């Protein structure tokens, strides 16, 4: 109970910067006192979560983030604090809170954040011609890779999906969070171009890997459909997927087929 309680107190205390909490454990013969006070708030929380992960570095080998991105704003009685950064990894670690309560199933505040983040990233990439060469579309999954984020919301009368408060369902929150994140994060990207380009390079790399994986899946499916269609098992497919510019050689016997393969371009020719 004590360790679980301490962990909960420890994380929540990040959301209340400057306030000290004293935890006294009298269950043992020797009384144990633990004190928690974090002046850095959600910024310090993100650094705590990211402490053991491989940092995203610049060309000089230095940590890209001297400190995490921090957003603080208010609209229509909704107070928002958000901090985020990227590391070199592939997994996302995101903690949405409402009135100091963690929503493990997310909710409207998380949906608003994701929507704004995807919009800001794509807008910045397009405005700086970072996608033109690769002809890619960045998705939310690409942005998630290596993202660590804490969202803390303070709102009157929040609505949850159940008594456990694991998911926020207040409908008005999504647009408010989306508007605030979009506005503040756009400014941050414009003011920090060197860091922004390193972030985008990581995200674009994830998008390229996703695109390569998609094409590989399509190729496997296409070849599988050819086999299922009853075509001869000895048909050697060409390497490109488009019909234009390709040709089909039909020969009699394996020996002739071997000569045909040696004398043709496998990129455009099926034998």
Q: Language-model segments: what does each one mean?
A:
Residues 171-176, 180-195, 244-270:
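Metal-dependent catalytic core segments for phosphate chemistry
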Residues 218-223:
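N-terminal cationic and glycine-rich segments that engage phosphates or anionic surfaces
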Residues 11, 16-19, 23-166, 227-262:
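GHKL/Histidine-kinase-like ATPase module
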Residues 1-10, 265-271:
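Single conserved hydrophobic/aromatic residue that forms the stacking wall/gate
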Residues 140-199:
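Extended, well-ordered alpha-helical scaffold/bundle regions in very large, multi-domain proteins
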Residues 215, 228, 267-270:
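Cofactor-binding active-site loop characterized by glycine-rich and histidine/acidic residues
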């Amino acid at each position: 109970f004590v360790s679980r309680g301490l962990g909960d107190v420890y994380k929540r205390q990040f959301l209340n910067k400057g306030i000290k909490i004293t935890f006294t454990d009298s269950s043992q013969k020797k009384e144990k006192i633990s004190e928690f006070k974090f002046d850095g708030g959600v910024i310090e929380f993100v650094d705590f979560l990211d402490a053991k992960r491989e940092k995203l570095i610049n060309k000089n080998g230095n940590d890209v983030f001297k400190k995490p991105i921090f957003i603080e704003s208010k609209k229509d009685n909704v107070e928002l604090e958000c901090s985020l950064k990227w590391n070199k990894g592939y997994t996302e670690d995101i903690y949405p809170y409402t009135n100091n309560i963690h929503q493990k199933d997310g909710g409207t505040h998380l949906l608003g954040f994701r929507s704004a983040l995807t919009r800001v990233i794509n807008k910045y990439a397009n405005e700086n011609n970072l996608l033109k060469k690769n002809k890619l579309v960045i998705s939310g999954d690409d942005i998630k890779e290596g993202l660590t984020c804490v969202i803390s919301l303070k709102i009157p009368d929040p609505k949850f999906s159940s008594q456990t408060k694991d998911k926020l369902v207040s409908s008005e929150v999504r647009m408010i969070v989306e508007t605030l994140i979009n506005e503040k994060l756009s400014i941050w990207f414009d003011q920090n171009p060197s860091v922004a380009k390193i972030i985008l390079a990581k995200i674009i790399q994830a998008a390229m890997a996703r695109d390569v994986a998609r094409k590989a899946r399509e190729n496997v499916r296409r070849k599988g459909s050819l086999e299922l269609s009853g075509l001869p098992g000895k048909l050697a497919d060409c390497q490109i997927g488009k019909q234009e510019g390709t040709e089909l050689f039909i020969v009699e016997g394996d020996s002739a087929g071997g000569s045909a393969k040696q004398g043709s371009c496998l990129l455009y020719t099926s034998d």
